[in-house]
Amino acid sequence: QGCCNGPKGCSSKWCRDHARCC
């Protein structure tokens, strides 16, 4: 679970906005 497991991976804007997920 977390942004790095999301469809866009850690480079996506969503992930950067939720950096604690990484």
From Swiss-Prot:
Positions bearing Pyrrolidone carboxylic acid: 1
InterPro entries in the record: Conotoxin_mu-typ
Gene Ontology CC: one annotated term: extracellular region
Secreted keyword on record: yes
Record flagged with keyword Secreted: yes
Tissue specificity note: Expressed by the venom duct.
S-S bridge residues: 3-15, 4-21, 10-22
GO molecular function: acetylcholine receptor inhibitor activity; sodium channel inhibitor activity; toxin activity
Chief subcellular location: secreted
Subcellular location: Secreted
Written domain comment of the UniProt record: The cysteine framework is III (CC-C-C-CC).
Other known facts: Negative results: 1 uM does not block cardiac mNav1.5/SCN5A and DRG-specific rNav1.8/SCN10A channels. 5 uM does not block voltage-gated potassium channels rKv1.1/KCNA1, rKv1.2/KCNA2, hKv1.3/KCNA3, rKv1.4/KCNA4, rKv1.5/KCNA5, rKv1.6/KCNA6, Shaker, hERG1/KCNH2. Found in both injectable (milked) (IV) and dissected venom (DV).
Function: Mu-conotoxins block voltage-gated sodium channels (Nav). This synthetic toxin blocks both voltage-gated sodium channels and nicotinic acetylcholine receptor (nAChR). Inhibits the skeletal muscle rNav1.4/SCN4A (IC(50)=1.3 nM) and the brain rNav1.2/SCN2A in a long-lasting manner. A low inhibition is also observed on neuronal mNav1.6/SCN8A and mNav1.7/SCN9A. Modestly blocks nAChR alpha-3/beta-2 subtype (IC(50)=450 nM) (partially reversible) and, to a lesser extent, alpha-7 and alpha-4/beta-2 subtypes (reversible).
Protein name: Mu-conotoxin CnIIIC
Organism from which the protein derives: Conus consors
Lineage: Eukaryota, Metazoa, Spiralia, Lophotrochozoa, Mollusca
